[in-house]
């Protein structure tokens, strides 16, 4: 049983990408709007989209967004285990904000009993002083092959004594089968943790699903806590993970085309969301087998969890030749974090931090070299752009030190120190600062340099408005009796 007196509820899904993250964010904002002290919590997240929490250390960007929705400072305790994939079957493990180690799938399973203690400790800290904690599961509790030692779904819920609401995605089809199938496959103790379910992403006349609700209740005995429509405001929230990225074909059909090569281990690609939100920008995600568009004015190389292997893939795709042609045509390039490292002459990894390749040539567009180092830089930062004399607010999460002649032309001054590099002609820029496009003045300066002089929206305000809209939709479409019990 939970020692804390804070109320808690856990949203688990019938599968991945059913909308748990957005629902948790919406419920956090709804509770905060009613004056409650509410906090989000996710025992285990797998994502290369990380944030720097307000108390230092890494958490998933989704939990950072949920803390924003809750109007509460973010904390490493809100996402005690973060897995950052860096190979096909291996991940870096972040525990309570700090690097714990690396492990492949089977090795990680053996670590779970140890990690459960950290998860429960973090949950107690998050719950202390809160009125309500809203917990997000990962994947699906129906993955019974992973039930032993589970810390992400029912393993956590049963140990912490937190009731579960199951979320099903009707948009992808088969929602009745997924809910009833989950009921059928769960062990009795896990099944007893489920208080009810929510249908998410519904389109059309809700009354057409009345028979579906009755059928689900007949098979499972679970009540329906609401049928939530497709939440349009969710499109204005930062993208969470690569599942979402697969659907982000482009932004608007605007005058400025910006191309973004999608690397296998792309990280922190929500850096691009503010650009995607601009109506006069067309943001094109270039996937495997595609060419970097010849008519792109700007190419952005995003962050990477594994710079050296992603650089090899970049070349294998022929994107290095595309990029050289782009530069010869007068095009511009921005590299962020791992993308910045790729733009240099050489990447050295003498300690083999990223694997077996000890050094590899870069793309040669900046006169810099990077050496990987074991100590990771993790911090929120205030900066100023040297290009547009614009304030920047962002964060740094990176391994490695970059030096070279082009660093004498820094792209930003971060916390009083130089960061990044500019080519002599100013057309190639690199930086370690994530979040720079979310700084409205910088984004305005960048777009103005391409001849786009329209008024720029306040990106943070747009996210806040989206959260309020989602909270309002949940208040309208969730069972008022269930909400009353949850929110007091």
Swiss-Prot record:
Keyword match Cell division: no
Q: Which domain of life is it from?
A: Bacteria
This protein's pathway: Cofactor biosynthesis; adenosylcobalamin biosynthesis
Which of UniProt's keywords are assigned here? Cobalamin biosynthesis, Glutamine amidotransferase
Q: What InterPro entries does its record include?
A: Class_I_gatase-like, CobQ/CobB/MinD/ParA_Nub-bd_dom, CobQ_GATase1, CobQ_N, CobQ_synth, GATase_3, P-loop_NTPase
| A Pfam entry, by short name | CbiA
Work out whether the entry's keyword set contains Signal.
no
GO biological process terms, alphabetically, are:
cobalamin biosynthetic process
What GO annotations for molecular function exist for this entry?
ABC-type vitamin B12 transporter activity; catalytic activity
Q: Which residues form the GATase cobBQ-type domain?
A: 255-442
Active site (record annotation): 337, 434
Q: Which PANTHER family match?
A: COBYRIC ACID SYNTHASE, DETHIOBIOTIN SYNTHETASE
Task: Give a short account of what the protein does.
Answer: Catalyzes amidations at positions B, D, E, and G on adenosylcobyrinic A,C-diamide. NH(2) groups are provided by glutamine, and one molecule of ATP is hydrogenolyzed for each amidation.
Q: Which family does it belong to?
A: Belongs to the CobB/CobQ family. CobQ subfamily.
HAMAP family per UniProt: CobQ (MF_00028)
Q: NCBIfam families per the record?
A: cobQ, PRK00784.1
Query: What is this protein's record name?
Result: Cobyric acid synthase
Recorded source organism is Rhizobium johnstonii (strain DSM 114642 / LMG 32736 / 3841) (Rhizobium leguminosarum bv. viciae)
